[in-house]
From Swiss-Prot:
Annotated substrate binding sites: 69-70, 91, 185
Subcellular location: Cytoplasm
Entry's Gene Ontology cellular component terms: cytoplasm
Amino-acid biosynthesis in keyword set: yes
Signal peptide residues on this chain, from the entry's feature table: none
Catalysed reaction, written as an equation: N-acetyl-L-glutamate + ATP = N-acetyl-L-glutamyl 5-phosphate + ADP
Protein name: Acetylglutamate kinase
Keywords from the named record: Amino-acid biosynthesis, Arginine biosynthesis, ATP-binding, Cytoplasm, Kinase, Nucleotide-binding, Transferase
Pathways per UniProt: Amino-acid biosynthesis; L-arginine biosynthesis; N(2)-acetyl-L-ornithine from L-glutamate: step 2/4
Protein origin, superkingdom: Bacteria
Protein family membership: Belongs to the acetylglutamate kinase family. ArgB subfamily.
Annotated source species: Chlorobium chlorochromatii (strain CaD3)
Location, primary (coarse class): cytoplasm
Length: 286
């Protein structure tokens, strides 16, 4: 056998050996994955993500998937003649828009993800936040401007655990309702954070369009709360990244072991972040 053939085989073997202690460590643990961005739009990336999630479940990690779908909601709204408006990055949601969100997010987007995981050998089940009181919500503090945008009040962990114990991957659409039956649009990042805290998850992983926290040309492998505060003060962490960073540390304060931010456009980033020493994104640490 030529050295050209031996080299890649040896590299593959080394990756598998490196993964083994992580597989042992995380068997039976719960990972909440927030799925969004470009990884939801490109067919190659969608298939790769579904493969990665299926593999994680096959090696014994309990996966709970929370997804976004903002672009799909906007497209559906446009077809129905509805204009999308945003305040501080949140979609203004009236009764017409909440119907579009429920139809699109809990309908087509959710079922497409379930189908894709199934095609790659996984067993997924679509869950609307309305199912079995999965997500109870209350109005956002800025409801006067935002309308039917909600914040998570309570998670039905018994239902999610029941699905996970059956070997299924719950795929959760972040909509919720209150005790009066009012429906709410819930930010997917916020929903993923609340679900991971409620489940006492080992990890929360944000699959996004950025490679991690970047300083100059370097992606930080880890970042502490003090380091993040300094980078925010210096303007290096800015814009939409600030609430994501704040949410990550709030999630850890709530008892979640680790929070990761990875690039969904990078090849097999989910597996590499979890099963290799170096990782590929940024890990938030206490």
């Amino acid at each position: 056998m030529s050295s050209e053939r031996k080299a890649p085989h040896a590299a593959i073997g080394q990756v598998l050996i490196e993964a083994l202690p992580y597989i042992r460590q995380f068997e039976g643990k719960t990972f909440v994955i927030k799925y969004g961005g470009a990884a939801m739009k490109d067919d190659t990336l969608k298939n790769m993500f579904a493969q990665n999630v299926t593999l994680l479940r096959k090696v014994g990690i309990r996966i709970v998937l929370v997804h976004g779908g903002g672009d799909a909601i906007t497209r559906t709204a446009e077809k129905l003649g509805l204009q999308s408006r945003f305040v501080q990055g949140r979609r203004v949601t009236d009764k017409e828009m909440i119907s579009v969100i429920q139809m699109t997010l809990a309908g087509k987007v959710n079922q497409d993800i379930v189908q894709l995981i199934s095609e790659h050998g996984g067993k997924a089940v679509g869950v609307s936040g309305l199912d079995a009181d999965t997500i109870k919500a209350h109005p956002h503090p800025n409801a006067e401007q935002l309308g039917l945008v909600g914040e998570v009040e309570q998670i039905n962990t018994d239902y999610i655990d029941l699905l996970s114990q059956a070997g299924l991957i719950p795929v959760i659409a972040p909509v919720g309702f209150d005790c009066d039956g009012n429906l709410y649009n819930i930010n997917a990042d916020d929903a993923a954070s609340s679900i991971s805290i409620a489940l006492k998850a080992e990890k929360l992983i944000y699959v996004s369009d950025v490679a991690g926290i970047q300083v100059g040309d370097k992606i930080l492998k880890t970042i502490s709360k003090a380091e993040a505060a300094d980078l925010i003060e210096r303007g290096i962490i800015s814009g939409g990244m600030i609430p994501k960073v704040v949410s990550a540390f709030n999630t850890m304060d709530g008892g979640v072991g680790k929070v990761h931010l990875i690039d969904g456009k990078s090849t097999h980033s989910l597996l590499l972040e979890i099963f290799t020493h170096e990782g590929v994104g940024t890990q938030f640490i206490n």
